[in-house]
């Protein structure tokens, strides 16, 4: 039950963060709209945000937690403290250097990253200034991820999971109260991001101190633990960040498309992050320390059992989430974003992107379960090979879909990028499972046939229920009524799905870890 308790804690904090994130997006799109200024913020913040996800949900955690868990399990507390001190010093040194280089090279980075902006000098200059400001978040974010990884390894999940809430709260406050004091109103978001980074790191400190793990940093790149983490992390930097790399590449493509394309894709991506963060990231965060411990204990049966449980939860939640996002795309976008500077055309364009991305939600969630199966065994090379193939698939699919939409003269070219991201995620998840199965690390056993049929039956029932409920949906009402209608649609879907699962014979005890 410890796994469920930890998962519920992380999911609850993630839900709070995601809900506040939706409020944040509503506020930002209402204040700035889906136009040139907001495009510059999305592009400029994409790079530090990429590193945030790389560290908080990616390479650093995947490399550091297994090594720290091994130290905690088989060595003394003093040796653990020494490891933490050395990693702290080395990480702070590398990130400070990287941040300074990025600030100096900001124009070059923006020219490479968003070449389409260069044709508009004002837009390019604003994006460069915004990047110089937001990239400072990189140092605070990396140290926050370091502290969070330590706490997660010791079974403390609530404080690290709460940290993203502060980023959303700071950005809302910046948009509402800092904007009037800025020559360029959008720059208020950059300052809000830096304030959030400081707060996210600060809230970790008391709990580290209580656990006697608040150790002064010392630089020692030759320390055995640091050396192992670096060797694991270098390939993991690519392997666990495929989704973010694809988003970066998609942003480059989108910078050449019509104004608003970056914002439409961003808004649609935010909708997919709700189920991904609530279930996928929560499960991935919780199981990595446990899988690492099972590997250290050399207990393959418990290892496989834990992965089977995680996959079951992911498929049970991910399939209906994908279906619901596709069917409810327009009502959701209308209810959340269509106000102020965000027009009905923006709603249509964002909904199209969301429909294209919805099919990849289950794949993105499965990646969060399959990848830790390798990282817990300190195997970072396999995800790298898979990641290379996924990035190649994304690039090829981008060319194919963009070419096709140009051929048929389709106005919503940004849909091509969303479809390519979905296809790339499916390739990534499929190949990760192939190698897990091939190496007898994890496979869907014969019991999955019944489970899969139960899930499919429940999804069909949910589709029918939502289709009927949508016939009563009315967009010509007040904003709050739209929100209420969407909530009712979601309740109808959940009730229909759960009821169908029970009719099919699925019971809560089947989700026991």
Please annotate each region the language model reported.
Residues 1-513:
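Membrane-embedded alpha-helical bundles of multi-pass transporters/translocases
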């Amino acid at each position: 039950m410890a796994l469920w308790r930890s998962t519920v804690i992380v999911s609850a904090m993630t839900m709070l963060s995601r809900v506040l994130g939706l409020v944040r997006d509503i506020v930002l799109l209402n204040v700035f709209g889906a136009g040139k200024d907001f495009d510059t913020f999305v592009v400029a913040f994409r790079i530090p945000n990429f590193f945030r996800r790389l560290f908080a949900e990616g390479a650093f955690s995947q490399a550091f937690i297994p090594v720290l868990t091994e130290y905690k399990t088989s060595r003394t507390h003093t040796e653990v403290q020494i490891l933490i001190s050395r990693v702290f010093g080395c990480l702070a040194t590398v990130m400070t250097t990287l941040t300074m280089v990025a600030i100096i090279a900001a124009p070059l980075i923006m020219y490479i990253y968003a070449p389409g902006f260069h044709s508009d000098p004002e837009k390019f200059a604003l994006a460069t200034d915004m990047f110089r400001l937001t990239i400072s978040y990189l140092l605070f974010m990396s140290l926050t991820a370091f502290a969070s990884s330590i706490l997660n390894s010791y079974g403390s999940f609530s404080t690290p999971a709460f940290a993203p809430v502060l980023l959303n709260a700071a950005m809302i406050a910046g948009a509402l109260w800092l904007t009037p004091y800025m020559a360029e109103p959008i720059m208020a978001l950059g300052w809000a991001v830096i304030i959030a980074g400081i707060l996210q790191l600060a809230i970790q400190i008391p709990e580290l101190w209580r656990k006697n793990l608040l150790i002064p940093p010392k630089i020692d790149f030759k320390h055995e633990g640091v050396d192992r983490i670096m060797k694991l992390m270098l390939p993991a930097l690519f392997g666990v960040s495929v989704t973010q790399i694809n988003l970066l590449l998609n942003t480059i493509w989108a910078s050449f498309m019509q104004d608003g394309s970056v914002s439409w894709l961003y808004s649609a991506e935010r909708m997919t992050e709700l189920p991904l963060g609530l279930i996928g990231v929560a499960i991935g965060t919780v199981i990595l320390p446990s899988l690492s411990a099972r590997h250290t204990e050399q207990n393959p049966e418990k290892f496989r059992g834990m992965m089977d449980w995680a996959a079951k939860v992911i498929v049970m939640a991910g399939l209906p989430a994908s279906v619901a996002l596709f069917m409810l795309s327009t009502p959701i976008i209308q209810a959340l974003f269509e106000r102020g500077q965000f027009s009905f055309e923006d709603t249509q364009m964002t909904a199209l992107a969301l429909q294209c991305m919805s099919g990849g939600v289950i794949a993105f969630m499965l990646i969060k379960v399959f990848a830790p199966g390798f990282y817990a065994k300190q195997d970072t090379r396999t995800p790298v090979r898979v990641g290379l193939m996924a990035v190649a698939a994304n690039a090829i699919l981008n060319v194919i879909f963009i070419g096709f939409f140009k051929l048929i003269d389709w106005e919503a070219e940004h849909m091509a990028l969303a479809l390519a991201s979905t296809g790339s995620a499916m390739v990534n998840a499929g190949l990760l499972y192939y190698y897990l199965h091939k190496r007898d690390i994890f496979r869907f056993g014969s019991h999955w046939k019944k489970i899969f049929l139960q899930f499919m039956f429940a999804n069909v029932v949910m589709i029918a229920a939502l289709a009927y409920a949508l016939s009563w949906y009315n967009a010509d009402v007040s904003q709050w009524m739209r929100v209420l209608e969407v909530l009712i649609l979601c309740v109808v879907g959940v009730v229909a799905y759960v009821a169908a699962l029970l009719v099919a014979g699925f019971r809560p005890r089947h989700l026991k870890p």
